[in-house]
Amino acid sequence: MPDSSHSISSKDVASAISLYDQSIYTNNRSTNLDLDQRSMSPSNIASGEDRITRTNSGCSITSGASMIATKDGIQGINVKRDGIPKYSLNLLNSMVRKQYDHNNGTKSPTPKTSNMVDPKNKKKNKKKKNDKDDKYKVSHDQTEKFYKLNTTSNSNLTSDSTTSLSDQFYFQKSNADSAPLDNANYPLSDHSPSLNSMDNTTKHSSNVHT
């Protein structure tokens, strides 16, 4: 525990007494001005072996007491102060750094870990996944499915005009039967007439006319 005993020098006693002796300031204004100028001159700032003291300035009662630089206030061991203390330098450096970052819009880089995902790559992967899902998705709308099958079959057919209508229906029906279904709740309903029913109807009508 630091020694709480504090030695009071003669200068400290003189400064303390001058706080209560205001008669020297009541003579005239020139005397007060002269005292203030002399007390603020560098020659009136005394330094001891292990402390720095300041004599009475005469400016105010609070500034009249001699200030002694110690480690932990008035009580404690006297220490030498060579420049700004280390903790004050650290505080100033941190404040200056924050102000610099604020003015220049720069922030200290955060370390990247293996668990973190780059936002740009995340968006790219999501877009890729959506495109893949759209590619293999089978529509549940029968009209849309029939339209797709119809356009696919027409594009696969040659441009030969001799292709019959029954061949086109057979091709569409075979494609519709082989199309995969995502959900069993949506069975494929065949709204188009079958080839056999068309042929039978045609044959029946021809027999009636004959």
Swiss-Prot record:
Keywords in alphabetical order: Phosphoprotein
Stretch list, region Disordered: 33-58, 100-139, 177-210
Where composition is biased (Polar residues), the residues are 33-46, 102-116, 191-210
Task: Keyword check for Phosphoprotein, yes or no.
Answer: yes
User: Which cellular component appears as one GO term in the record?
Assistant: nucleus
Feature: compositional bias, Basic and acidic residues: 130-139
- Locate the Phosphoserine modifications and list their residues: 18, 39, 41, 57, 60, 178, 189, 192
Miscellaneous: Present with 1890 molecules/cell in log phase SD medium.
What is this protein called in UniProt?
Answer: Uncharacterized protein YER079W
